[in-house]
Amino acid sequence: MRIDLCALERNLGKLKYFMPKSRGYIALVSADAFGYGVEAAAVRLMLSGADAFAVTNVSEGARVREVGSGWEIVVMSSSLPGEEDEYFENSLTPVLVSCEEIARFEKKAEELGATLAVHMRLPTVGETVPSPEEAKKMLDALLESKRLKLEAFCLLGTGTGAPQEGAKPDADFVEYAKMKTDSLGAKIFVHHSDVCDVSALPFDRALRAGLVLFGMKPSENSILKGFEPEHVLTFRSSVSQIKNLPKGATVGYGRTYTLKKDSRVALLSVGYGDGVPRNASEKMDVIIRGKRATVIGRVSMDQAAIDVSDFDEIEVGDEAIIVGESGGISIPIEEYAGRLGITPAQALTSITKRVARFYKMLY
C-alpha cells in the first residue's frame, strides 16, 4: 500500500474551504485510521489543522494520545466497567449513554480528585439508547456535576444502507437541553457525521470527518455532496507467474473456474490473506501497463489469477494496481468495493497487516 499523506493533508484543507464556518473538525480515525495506520495519519492531521480526533474505544484512543498531546480525543463507543482509569490517564473524552456510566465516571473522578471533559449521546427518533427520558436525567446530572464537564452532544448517523443515514434528533429533548443550557449559561456544541442534517439544532456544530478525509467521495445524502477529495491510497501487487493454458483448463483455488478458450493467465502475489475477498472472481479488475485485467477463479490465501490474453506485453514483476491509478486508468475504492458487494470502509479495513504500508510524507 502506498499512502499519500500530502493528499490527506490537502483533503482536510479543502474540506475547511468547502464547508461553511463551524466550530471545528473532528478527524475520525477508527479501526487504525481505516487501515491506513493511525499513528502516521494522526500525526499528519495534527500538523494539518484537525481540531480533535474521534476513535472507537480506549485502546485506539491511547494510540492516538501516544503521538500527540493537546488534542481532544473522543471515544465514540460506550465505556466498559473498569475502563475509567484509562480515560483519566490518557485524557480521553467519553461519549456517555447512560446514568450508570455517569455514576462510574463521577466516582472515579472523586477518587482521583480530578475533572474530566465528557460528551453525551444525543437521543434520536427510533433509537432507545439513551431514551429521551434518560437523556434528560443524564443532562441534569452532568450540568450539576463538579467533576464531569459536559462539552458536547454527539449525534450519530445510522450507517450506510439504512433507510435514512442521518439520525433525526429527538425534538423534545433538544428543546429541553436548550432551555437548561441557556439558563445556566453553558456553552454546549454538537458534533455530527456528514449525513446528519443539523441545520435546525440550536447549538454550535462540529463535523466528524472520516472516510472523506481518506479519499472517499461523500454519499448522495451527505451535506458534503459535491466535495471531491483526492485519492490517498494505492493498493498494489505484482505479477508472479504467467502461463498459457488450453481451453478447459481449471484456474483458481479449488479449480472452480474453467477456461472457455485458450488463454494466457497470470498469477498475482495477493490473496485473501492480504484482504482481497475469496469470491472476487469476475468481480475485480487490476491495472497492469495501463490496461485492465479481470480476476478469474477463486482467490487463495496468497494468490489470485487474472486473464491477460489480450495483453501484448506483460512480464513477471509487473505492477498490478488493485485500487489506485496507473497509465491514466483509475480504479477508485468505491468501484473496487461496489463490485465486490461491500462498503469502502469494509474494503479498507480488510487489508491486513501483511500488506506493508509506505507513506509519501513530502511534497
Give short role names for the model-derived ranges.
Residues V75, L150, V239, V295-I296:
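A structural signal for short, hydrophobic beta-strand segments that form beta-sheets
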Residues P246-Y363:
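C-terminal accessory subdomain/extension
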Residues L5, E9-K16, A42, G61-A62, ...:
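Generic structural signal for well-ordered alpha-helices
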Residues L8, S30, V64, M120, ...:
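Conserved, mostly hydrophobic/aromatic
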Residues A54, V74, V95-L96, C154, ...:
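Conserved beta-strand positions in the central sheet of alpha/beta enzyme cores
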Residues N90-E127:
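A generic, well-ordered mixed alpha/beta core segment in the N-terminal half of proteins
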Residues M1-T93, T115, K149, R357-Y363:
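A charged N-terminal "starter" segment
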Residues A31-Y36, V43-R44, K108, T115, ...:
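Active-site loop/helix belt of alpha/beta enzymes
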